[in-house]
């Protein structure tokens, strides 16, 4: 059996997965929080993310490992079939968050971070406790920062409050 450590950041910083390949070629990935089973995504609606771009890259890395016989995520059931489908579902959930934020800003012109967090939570039907608020707030901030870094959003400080708006695209 061969053991490999694979950097899988995104959900958290410096996350690693462990790939075990047996002598007969069977592959098991201990993925940690780099991938969520379908039921977990449905349960939380908004997967906690520290770095959206890295999260997508980590999902691509998992996809590039080839056929996995077992994928052991940090939460939920083991994934024994349709790993590629599960990867796509994870990506779709991330794209849905991005799309939600962009649509909110198209409709509202500009929003403060806190109002954005509230609106995203309402759209994804999340009933927030204090703990849940912290997780959702961090995730929404991650997406806002990534969209800003990618030239899609801009931020302005108005009366000591951060406001987000779509960056005007040159035609």
Question: Where is each model-derived feature located?
Answer:
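Metallo-beta-lactamase
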Residues: 2-98
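C-terminal regulatory/interaction regions
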Residues: 103-171
């Amino acid at each position: 059996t061969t053991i490999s450590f694979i950097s899988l950041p995104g959900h958290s910083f410096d996350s690693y997965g462990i790939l075990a390949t047996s002598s007969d070629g069977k592959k098991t990935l201990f993925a940690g929080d780099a991938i969520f089973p379908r039921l977990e995504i449905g349960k939380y609606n908004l997967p906690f993310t520290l770095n959206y771009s890295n999260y997508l890259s980590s999902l691509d890395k998992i996809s590039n490992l080839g056929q996995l016989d077992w994928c052991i995520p940090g939460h939920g059931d083991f994934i024994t079939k349709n790993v590629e489908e599960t990867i796509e579902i994870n990506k779709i959930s991330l794209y849905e968050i991005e799309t939600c934020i962009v649509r909110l800003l198209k409709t509202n012109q500009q929003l403060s971070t806190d109002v954005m967090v509230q609106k995203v939570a309402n759209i994804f039907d999340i009933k927030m406790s204090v703990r849940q608020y912290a997780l959702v707030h961090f995730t929404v901030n991650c997406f806002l920062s990534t969209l800003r870094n990618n030239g899609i959003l801009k931020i302005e400080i108005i009366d000591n409050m951060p406001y987000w708006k779509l960056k005007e695209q040159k035609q």
